[in-house]
Amino acid sequence: MVIDKSIPKATAKRLSLYYRIFKRFHADQVEKASSKQIADAMGIDSATVRRDFSYFGELGRRGFGYDVTKLMNFFADLLNDHSTTNVILVGCGNIGRALLHYRFHDRNKMQIAMGFDTDDNALVGTKTADNIPVHGISSVKERIANTDIETAILTVPSIHAQEVTDQLIEVGIKGILSFAPVHLQVPKGVIVQSVDLTSELQTLLYFMNQNHLD
């Protein structure tokens, strides 16, 4: 199957949602799903589904629907969800602590293996209820050495975000999910995905205000 390497970012962001939908269909013993069924489950239109799928070659035949098991496995392969992906979390403040207790592995095969914070943080040396250890950031290099960990969740204050990012890149981190509302400078080959909660809320309020004007 030929996959277009240059898929739009909007399409890429929907990949995990498609995977979730096909897992749900599979659990409900649905064998075939039309683009309309997929679109309705996603809250988008059928044309968007067909356009997204066109980037991945021949996923189904027009008029026959999409094979649910085949597509579930396809997206599992695409998202590397056949094996467990371990990640680290850096910054054990309010957001960080909440994420440490979030059970990622209940839905997908990924889990937080370790948490890190400043060496003087009271949580350092303890474990969460799910047995996730929290270490001092000065030990991050030795802690992830000889592991397959290449991904980090960053929940540190904005003023420290770039410094910590540089430190993580030095120890081999290739992907960062950042909750810091600042632009991070990273070298080629390192991917940063930003989550700006304030921006998302402001966008929501904008659309709500526009809705009131209609």
From Swiss-Prot:
GO cellular component: cytoplasm
Subcellular location: Cytoplasm
Main location per the UniProt record: cytoplasm
DNA-binding region: 17-56
GO biological process per UniProt: negative regulation of DNA-templated transcription; response to redox state
Keywords, in A-Z order: Cytoplasm, DNA-binding, NAD, Repressor, Transcription, Transcription regulation
One Pfam short name: Put_DNA-bind_N
Keyword Transcription regulation: yes
GO MF terms, alphabetically ordered: DNA binding; DNA-binding transcription factor activity
SMART domains named among the record's database cross-references: CoA_binding (SM00881)
Signal peptide span: none
Gene3D superfamilies: NAD(P)-binding Rossmann-like Domain, Winged helix-like DNA-binding domain superfamily/Winged helix DNA-binding domain
Keyword Metal-binding: no
Residues that hold NAD(+) according to the record: 91-96
Alphabetized InterPro entries for the sequence: CoA-bd, NAD(P)-bd_dom_sf, Rex_DNA-bd_C_dom, Tscrpt_rep_Rex, WH-like_DNA-bd_sf, WH_DNA-bd_sf
Function: Modulates transcription in response to changes in cellular NADH/NAD(+) redox state.
Family of this protein: Belongs to the transcriptional regulatory Rex family.
Known partners and oligomeric status: Homodimer.
Protein name: Redox-sensing transcriptional repressor Rex
Gene that encodes the chain: rex
